[in-house]
């Protein structure tokens, strides 16, 4: 199997405190059929360095205050290369009417496509007292859709446990989704900064 991709990215900074970025990725994988071969994934990010604004000049104890946010998409095609193809195997030392047996090893799923991951991140980075205290507060949200997983095939498919392989009575397919979110907090404190440095 092989993969190929096209990538574009733009970054823009205005007055050294307004930040904007965007990217586009188009990925292709030979693991999928022609109709589903490509996946398009976008991302955008922005930032505002609040501490550089004129109204923050009297807040001398604030070394840095930055608001940031981003949205991004990525794809996953971590599946065997034969998912969209029927494959067969020959049973060794097993014959019927002097002919060696052949059985269906993998049943094709031509509808398989890219799994997509979407993420949203919002955060506030800070540094206080001449960078003696710094850290971040962030919220994240992750969503995975069209998850690539094995699904059990019914006995009527005719390949239940063919050849003694427990995996080939199932098929890779886009089934299910996953969602999680949460908050992250980070703080670093420099307690002493003279002849030696003590971090906590």
Segments the model singles out, each with a brief description of its role:
Residues 1-200:
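Extracellular/periplasmic, surface-exposed regions of secreted and cell-surface proteins
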């Amino acid at each position: 199997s092989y993969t190929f991709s096209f990538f574009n990215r733009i970054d823009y900074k205005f007055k050294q405190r307004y930040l904007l970025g965007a990217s586009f990725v188009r990925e292709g994988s030979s693991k999928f059929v022609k109709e589903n071969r490509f996946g398009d994934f976008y991302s955008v990010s922005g930032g505002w360095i609040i501490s550089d604004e004129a109204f923050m000049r009297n807040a001398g104890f604030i070394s840095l205050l930055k608001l940031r946010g981003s949205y991004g998409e990525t794809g996953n095609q971590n599946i065997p290369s034969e998912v969209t193809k029927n494959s067969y195997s020959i049973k060794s030392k097993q014959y019927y009417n002097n002919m060696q047996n052949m059985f269906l090893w993998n049943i094709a799923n031509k509808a398989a496509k890219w799994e997509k991951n979407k993420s949203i991140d919002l955060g506030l980075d800070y540094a206080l007292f001449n960078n003696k205290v710094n850290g971040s507060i962030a919220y994240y949200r992750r969503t995975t859709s069209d998850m690539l997983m094995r699904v059990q095939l019914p006995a009527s498919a005719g390949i239940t446990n063919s050849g003694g392989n427990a995996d080939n009575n199932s098929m890779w397919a886009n089934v299910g989704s996953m969602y999680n979110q949460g908050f992250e907090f980070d703080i670093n404190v420099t307690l002493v900064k003279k002849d030696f440095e003590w971090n906590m």
